């Protein structure tokens, strides 16, 4: 049944304004604060020079947009895997999991998402479960939208085991500009679908490896919303 608006719903003034701001302007991930602070410091130091001041303010705004951390509402249906990041689905194919995970070397479904510099670059848990492996592998910094990036570029792999025993692998891949992978997970962590677990700075890619028999729900060229778009349903 619909609820009648209360007095609190209709209030105006500073409290209402701040509530609107909080629901409209996404917060910033803590990893972005040093970059925003440095940009504002540049603007303050060059306040007598409009070009320097302007460059500092533009850089601060760009960093705030890049490191934005928008709230997301993941689906509650059991057995679904959500996109671990915002971006463009660039590949849907079968591929072997990263070798450093020491998993069986047989192809499984893989969905790749390319993140441009205009996407939110926080990464989100694709499915609830327990982290059973976290492996970082150094590599190159080629363009993340190329197929070879999955094999050649620096990457960080996280294996999540669900309550049913299925394993889903989320792989953060550095790109041409992205040179810093941040992952807050360790083996043994209990994780919840849609929660933030890391980021990659300035353009990157996310590969999601799925169990055999998984029903893929997306196609190349589709845009994904991290934490909300359903990539697949587990068998």
UniProtKB/Swiss-Prot annotation:
Gene Ontology MF, one: phosphatidylserine decarboxylase activity
Residues bearing PTM Pyruvic acid (Ser): 204
UniProt xrefs under Pfam families: PS_Dcarbxylase (PF02666)
Single GO BP term: phosphatidylethanolamine biosynthetic process
Cofactor(s) listed: pyruvate
UniProt-annotated location(s): Cell membrane
Gene Ontology, cellular component aspect: plasma membrane
Family in the record: Belongs to the phosphatidylserine decarboxylase family. PSD-A subfamily.
Subunit structure: Heterodimer of a large membrane-associated beta subunit and a small pyruvoyl-containing alpha subunit.
NCBIfam families: PRK05305.1-3
PANTHER family in UniProt: ARCHAETIDYLSERINE DECARBOXYLASE PROENZYME-RELATED
Name the record gives this protein: Phosphatidylserine decarboxylase proenzyme
Organism listed in the record: Mycobacterium sp. (strain JLS)
């Amino acid at each position: 049944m619909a609820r009648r608006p209360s007095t609190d719903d209709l209030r105006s003034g500073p409290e209402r304004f701040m509530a609107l701001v909080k629901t409209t302007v996404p917060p910033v991930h803590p990893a972005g604060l040093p970059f925003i602070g440095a940009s504002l410091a540049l603007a303050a130091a060059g306040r007598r020079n409009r070009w320097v001041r302007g460059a500092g303010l533009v850089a601060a705004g760009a960093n705030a947009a890049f490191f934005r951390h928008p709230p997301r509402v993941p689906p509650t249906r059991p057995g679904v895997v959500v996109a671990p990041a915002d971006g463009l689905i660039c590949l849907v194919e079968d591929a072997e999991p990263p070798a450093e995970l020491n998993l069986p070397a047989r192809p499984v479904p893989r969905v790749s998402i390319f993140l441009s510099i205009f996407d939110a670059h926080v990464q989100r848990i694709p499915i609830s479960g327990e982290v059973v492996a976290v492996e970082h592998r150094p590599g190159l910094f080629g363009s993340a939208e190329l197929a070879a990036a999955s094999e050649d570029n620096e990457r960080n792999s996280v294996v999540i085991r669900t309550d049913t025993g299925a394993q889903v692998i989320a792989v953060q891949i550095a790109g041409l500009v992205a040179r810093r992978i941040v992952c807050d997970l360790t083996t043994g962590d209990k994780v919840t679908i849609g929660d933030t677990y890391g980021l990659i700075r300035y353009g990157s890619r996310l590969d999601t490896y799925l169990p055999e028999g998984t029903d893929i729900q997306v196609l190349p060229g589709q845009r994904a919303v991290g934490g909300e778009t359903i990539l697949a349903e587990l068998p």
